[in-house]
Amino acid sequence: VGFLGISHLLPAPTKCGQSELAFALLEQKGNPGWLYSVINGATTIWERWNSYIAETGTFGDVSMNSFNHYAYGSIGQWLYRTVLGIQTGENADEAGYHKIFLTPSWGGTLTYAKGEQETPFGKIASSWEKKDNSIVYHCTIPANTTAHLTLPASGHNSVQILEGAAITDTAAV
């Protein structure tokens, strides 16, 4: 895929209704794959998928082998925008997180996700966890902002609001 195409690798199947494929790519443990480096001790994003070769215990060409490189770091954007679902609008009155869109997604073998986004208005928090046969979702938005929450609830028996401000439109629930 290369440095230029990697930022589209997970968003493309997600936008085409194939989010399970995106989650499978995220969770791929072999080389190439984001988890390959994690399984082999990485705490940063490597420049190359094969910066370290587990089978031989050797490192790739050190002249082009950064162990702290953003190239494949675009995965972070997909995790925030898709798994946590934190997004801002594209119109001028929505920009800068004045209007927030929360559209979390769960899939693959992930059992929870949790993250925050600092904005000019304050902190946005989004988290979900699979518990028994349910998914528990929590979100926090800053004062003086509005949020549109879309939960992937099709096929589920109910959506229950346990606390928080008014939910004004529950169509499609």
Language model region names:
Residues 1-6:
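Generic helix N-cap/helix-start motif at coil->alpha-helix transitions
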Residues 20-173:
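Non-catalytic C-terminal accessory modules of carbohydrate-active enzymes
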Residues 9-10:
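Conserved small-residue packing positions in alpha-helical repeats and bundles
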